[in-house]
Amino acid sequence: MRGPGVKKTAFSVLVALWMASATNAAWAQSNTLAYAEPTIEVDDQLRQKLLDNIRAADSFQDRFDAEAWLMLMSGRLERYVRDPDRRLRLLRKIHSAARQTDLQPELVLAVIEVESHFNHYAVSPVGAQGIMQVMPFWKNEIGRPEDNLIDLDTNLRYGCTILKHYLERSEGRLAEALARYNGSYGSYRYAAKVMDAWERWR
């Protein structure tokens, strides 16, 4: 996950084991390299951010702008989510989770496209779960083992919080932050994929 500057704050993260469908299997195969030997770091600051943000309520900052954004992004998301009502609900949640952590919603969309192709049941070969492919160990790290990472809202909160944390830690160096998020620090293949996708969403 690499790219230009992105601001501060933090929010959700992690992945737990769940339904592995044929679609998940095909997707997982293509992402095996990205998830090989993940090296995701845990620290007290990130734990606290997750705890602070996991309970936050979702809301748009500007209703008119949000609705205009939803309509624009809906057309772009159609290739992944056919049903228009489901598409708008999903976009609303993504926009809200991104804004709560002061992330650009289009960047979060790019991460999701690369991570799961918008399949919130996706499970990677190493167990990363949900739409933002969060690792299940994060639940224990913040003392919330009961959290369901397949739940869309929960997964977005975890994922956005983690991504924001790594952006702050890397002082806005998006490529580095994305590599840390993906557990592939030192390799920029994953970051390049996300940044290419980001260009399409912006």
What kind of feature is each model-predicted range?
Residues L51-R202:
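Catalytic glycan-binding domains that act on GlcNAc-containing polysaccharides
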Residues M1-G75, Y80-D85, R202:
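N-terminal secretory targeting signals
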